[in-house]
Regions:
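Small-residue-rich segments of transmembrane alpha-helices in multi-pass membrane proteins
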Residues: 1-4, 24-27, 52-62, 103-114, ...
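Hydrophobic mid-bilayer segments of alpha-helices in multi-pass membrane transport proteins
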Residues: 1-5, 17-29, 80, 182-191, ...
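Interfacial loop-to-helix junctions that mark the boundaries of transmembrane helices
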Residues: 9-20, 132-142, 175-180, 194-206, ...
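Membrane-embedded alpha-helical segments and adjacent helix-loop junctions characteristic
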Residues: 10-96, 230-232, 236-305
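Membrane-interface alpha-helices at helix entry/exit sites of multi-pass transporters
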Residues: 55-60, 90-102, 131-140, 269, ...
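Alpha-helical transmembrane segments and, especially, the helix-loop junctions at the ends
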Residues: 69-79, 96-130, 150-154, 279-296, ...
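Juxtamembrane and boundary regions of transmembrane helices in multi-pass small-molecule transporters
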Residues: 94, 133-177, 187, 318-372
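Hydrophobic alpha-helical transmembrane segments in multi-pass integral membrane proteins
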Residues: 115, 119, 190-199, 239-258, ...
Length: 372
């Protein structure tokens, strides 16, 4: 945009929302130390050890992955848990696809619960000025109902495979948990949550907790810094610049006009349904984060803006389950699985993803509109 003269360099700098980048960085530091301490592998191993049947394993994967993703970012959970799940299933001689798809979908659905669950929620949380507690309260029934629908549909679709008993005892690979480091990491996350619940700024509390984590970890900061996804931060910064360039070129104004015509309605049901349909389409065409950025300047001018912001967060998250390419979490699971000889086909995923997305979107609209 700058090279082609669409956007002057000072405008490009001004377009970057540093609140979002600071929030992401703070969360990445805390999550990075929890990764170093093997907290997520330990949590996955804990679930696997308690899954005596295929149905309980699927339930544990969907709900466990969802609840972890609700607070520690869905992409991270899929990145860490997928290899643990495959290692446990390897000797079992069972097809891993139901559990892998369950992990991806559960992580996507569960991540809707809080502003730390996924990048688009972080954007919505900051731009809507939502409180951490308020966002969580509104999204709690959405997330729990969504996880129940996801598990129920997966269990029905794969009922034939899930009826087969395990031929071998499910044994998870033991994890060497670094208890002192994990304890400090969870304590710093609890401090961050307390700060947010007390009304603290989302980015300020996140970066303060991340900095404190570096100080109290008693580990070389390089371990956590290596786990910061600098390419993602750069991607976000670049995305803000690109979207500002489109805005300067008039593309965003054109979208705004048509979006306003579509969702400006006295009926919250009609508006929420229209927003969800648009977000589901955009999220699978241009990805969910750019789709949310497109709404940044539109939503504040809409009636019931706070409701619409929550619908944007919900629909951009749930629509990630529509297709295999719908979210980064899906692609991470598919890539990790293929590297170990397990292939998730586009058609198999869509056979589950389309109905799950429609069911969870309908549930999300119903709950959010009913609760205001």
């Amino acid at each position: 945009m700058v090279v082609f003269g669409v956007l002057p360099l000072p405008d490009a700098y001004a377009a970057v929302d540093f609140d979002v980048l600071v929030f992401l960085l703070g969360m990445m530091l805390i999550v990075g130390y929890l990764e170093v301490g093997k907290f997520f592998e330990w949590a996955a191993e804990w679930v696997l050890r308690r899954a005596g049947t295929s149905e309980r394993l699927l339930l544990g994967v969907v709900v466990g992955g969802g609840l972890l993703s609700a607070f520690f970012v869905n992409d991270t959970i899929c990145l860490v848990v997928t290899p643990v799940l495959l290692a446990a299933l390897g000797p079992m001689r069972v097809r891993p696809n139901p559990y892998l798809i369950g992990l991806a979908m559960g992580a996507n659905v569960g991540s809707v619960l809080s502003v730390t669950g996924n990048p688009q929620n972080m954007l919505v949380g900051i731009w809507s000025r939502a409180t951490f507690g308020g966002f969580l309260v509104h999204m709690l029934p959405v997330a729990l109902g969504g996880l129940a629908l996801t598990y129920g549909y997966l269990r029905w679709v794969y009922r034939g495979e899930l009826r087969e008993p395990f031929r071998e005892r499910l044994e998870a690979v033991p994890v060497a948990l670094d208890r002192p480091l994990v304890t400090r990491g969870l304590a710093m996350f609890a401090v961050a949550v307390a700060g947010w619940l007390a009304g603290g700024s989302l980015p300020l509390v996140a970066i303060a907790a991340g900095a404190l984590m570096v100080l109290v970890a008693q580990r070389d900061p390089a371990y956590a810094i290596e786990r910061v996804d600098w390419s993602l931060l750069l991607f976000f910064g670049s995305l803000f610049v690109v979207m500002r360039g489109f805005e300067q070129a008039g593309a965003v104004a054109w979208i705004d006009r048509h979006a306003l015509d579509l969702v400006e309605s006295d009926s919250p049901w009609r508006a929420a349904t229209a927003v969800s349909a648009v977000m589901a389409t955009l999220s699978n065409l241009i990805s969910n984060v750019p789709a949310v950025i497109l709404w940044r300047n539109t939503v504040p001018h809409l009636p019931q803006a706070q409701l619409i912001w929550r619908v944007v967060a919900m629909s951009s998250t749930f629509s990630g389950n529509l297709l295999l390419i719908g979210s980064m979490a899906n692609l991470i699971v598919a890539e990790k699985a293929e590297a170990r000889g397990a292939r998730i086909g586009f058609g198999e995923y869509a056979r589950v993803g389309v109905p799950v997305t429609l069911l969870t979107l309908a549930w999300g609209i119903m709950v959010l509109v009913a609760t205001g």
